[in-house]
Amino acid sequence: MTERKKLVLVDGNSLAYRAFFALPLLSNDKGVHTNAVYGFAMILMKMLEDEKPTHMLVAFDAGKTTFRHGTFKEYKGGRQKTPPELSEQMPFIRELLDAYQISRYELEQYEADDIIGTLAKSAEKDGFEVKVFSGDKDLTQLATDKTTVAITRKGITDVEFYTPEHVKEKYGLTPEQIIDMKGLMGDSSDNIPGVPGVGEKTAIKLLKQFDSVEKLLESIDEVSGKKLKEKLEEFKDQALMSKELATIMTDAPIEVSVSGLEYQGFNREQVIAIFKDLGFNTLLERLGEDSAEAEQDQSLEDINVKTVTDVTSDILVSPSAFVVEQIGDNYHEEPILGFSIVNETGAYFIPKDIAVESEVFKEWVENDEQKKWVFDSKRAVVALRWQGIELKGAEFDTLLAAYIINPGNSYDDVASVAKDYGLHIVSSDESVYGKGAKRAVPSEDVLSEHLGRKALAIQSLREKLVQELENNDQLELFEELEMPLALILGEMESTGVKVDVDRLKRMGEELGAKLKEYEEKIHEIAGEPFNINSPKQLGVILFEKIGLPVVKKTKTGYSTSADVLEKLADKHDIVDYILQYRQIGKLQSTYIEGLLKVTRPDSHKVHTRFNQALTQTGRLSSTDPNLQNIPIRLEEGRKIRQAFVPSEKDWLIFAADYSQIELRVLAHISKDENLIEAFTNDMDIHTKTAMDVFHVAKDEVTSAMRRQAKAVNFGIVYGISDYGLSQNLGITRKEAGAFIDRYLESFQGVKAYMEDSVQEAKQKGYVTTLMHRRRYIPELTSRNFNIRSFAERTAMNTPIQGSAADIIKKAMIDMAAKLKEKQLKARLLLQVHDELIFEAPKEEIEILEKLVPEVMEHALALDVPLKVDFASGPSWYDAK
């Protein structure tokens, strides 16, 4: 019997790139981006399972320069720089391959394709079946009766297999002719020029007639079409060069042999360690790791959950783990499925109808003395409020505790926290209810046990989480900030914000009319009607008809992305109109129509969802609608705020905004004398910075100087690099670097803070805010310069951003208490960035003008005064 020999060759860069863009930007609890590694691991696991290779190698590109650059200097010149979020994941991909005991190889001056081509041909001679995996169709030229090329399509696991027959079926060509096709049509992704004006269809037609580029060029006279003949004659050398560039080498000087690529299985222990470190719980389950642990976990024994038909006070004791169950993300709309309670008397499931109709149950939920332990108290507050019940006595929130301890983790349900702490007593919501459109409510037996297990997990986790919070000096952050804030956010969400639907619709009509105007103007300049939203049609108009210089090409034609158009804005009037057209179109579709979709028809209110346990800095964000994201650079964008109005007659919107809070926090943390002096004396900080950096008197500071100073002031807060500042100011990187150096020379305290924060973070592994919030930054020890630089900037800016976020949260808690204490009707509606938005009766506005700044400015004592600007008006737009 012939021994089975199968070699799998993988284009590592291509699949890593594909995985990165196919998945959302994920990160683990330490803040390390992981989406490319996760996707690559999924591809790898599927590959090993499906292909069962006897031999395997993953090839990588060794660098940016290859022997092909000697032929054509601009080879791959149009490619965008690899995103740093992907670059930082490449070492983990290599580490993963080592754990899987899969050979990897790269060769200076050669591409991964050349390594693959050389090994494929060598393996064919040795009688191997060969499978090549890539996202690059160039490799289809390697397809033979012994080599199949698998090209990824959508996502990361959907592949198309190219055999010689499939190549013929798809292109009408042989695999050997793929390089001829590239020679004629070029390849924008690799910046291979080809012959201008020759696309895929023309190239295929010519090759069917002439077989190869060389034979075609020998027989140009036989080509039909005068223009095509002229192009082929003019670009003859370019066609031959393009074919050469597209040709994969099959005799590269590699130092590995096929026989040395034997695959004998992976190192289970190492793979599990990597998956755990990166937070790949789903992949751990696929390895069987969790199930193995679960079998040893005695707590998985059946629990006795009693279904309650009549709520009595003897089961409602304090403290109790309490579950308010819904499925789906939008808890403002999802119905409650039921409740569960676990305490010293037992485990209970209470069907929704029985619970909400029970006065005993309602009294217990609304009794502040009856302590409840929950998961996501804000969600529970909102869900119960829609039933006319106020949740009180929520003493412990598993979600918030876990978030404070592990801010980089994403906790979707109780099971995800339980797993992190080695508890296997509850299944994930997804495994019980299903996902997406397949989500469904199970039988009452299944539901009652699932809810009972959830409550049991909450009860079991509490002690562990409290202990860890105490050890981290974070119990006060949890008890005094995040827990009370959750209840306030819940009230804000359920109160909602009134939307003037008629005004919003009028805005939509106005924007529609403006869009029409721009469309007509663009068509007039172009000299013909065309679909402005079609990149292909727009590209033809801009680059062929008008003749603008081509900045970048895509596989389907010319790139007309925003960054490309901005580079061309000064070249022709039409470009500015197109940019305006797109901005107006986005305002209309994303914001006007988007807001109308989420506005409740009965109350004309939107009920956003604040994400309290999401960001690593502690900042709040919001969803459905994302109120943080309403554009304010364009006047049309700012005007959208006109649609947010008071919910009652003779009321106004009142907005209060921290002035330069992050710079004030920086002054406090860094103890920089210059910054402290400026803020203490209420100086214009940007003018002061310009004076110090440019060494000029106050009256000599120009608007350009102040603008540069402002950019560097805020840039420092966000850990800006010389590159980032150069982009913001439109200056060279060298000039930006010199500006930053002069800034740090003038602000020695800031310089010392930046250096000290990085050193401290390297020693501890994390940075902290003024209220002891932590952010873990393991990338500080990375050997990769880009990863390490990003981590250092994170170490510098997180204490500033995080402390500012904590201050505004504290202000919200203090304000809620003051409104209640003074028995005011005013309501806190929104928190957006550094701004608090209220609605209040007109007669209370004068009170708020004194009360709100006083409370906000004293939320936390700093070495410099906090300053609050405020205004009121009939809409959010007018409160400026």
From Swiss-Prot:
Keywords: DNA damage, DNA repair, DNA replication, DNA-binding, DNA-directed DNA polymerase, Exonuclease, Hydrolase, Nuclease, Nucleotidyltransferase, Transferase
Function, as annotated: In addition to polymerase activity, this DNA polymerase exhibits 3'-5' and 5'-3' exonuclease activity.
Family named by the database record: Belongs to the DNA polymerase type-A family.
Organism in which the protein naturally occurs: Bacillus subtilis (strain 168)
Self-association and partners: Single-chain monomer with multiple functions.
Name of the protein in question: DNA polymerase I
Keyword DNA-binding carried by entry: yes
GN (gene name): polA
Gene3D superfamilies: 3.30.70.370, 5' to 3' exonuclease, C-terminal subdomain (1.10.150.20), 5'-nuclease (3.40.50.1010), Ribonuclease H-like superfamily/Ribonuclease H (3.30.420.10), Taq DNA Polymerase, Chain T, domain 4 (1.20.1060.10)
PROSITE patterns (alphabetical): DNA_POLYMERASE_A (PS00447)
Top-level taxon of the source organism: Bacteria
Catalytic activity: DNA(n) + a 2'-deoxyribonucleoside 5'-triphosphate = DNA(n+1) + diphosphate
Entry keyword Hydrolase: yes
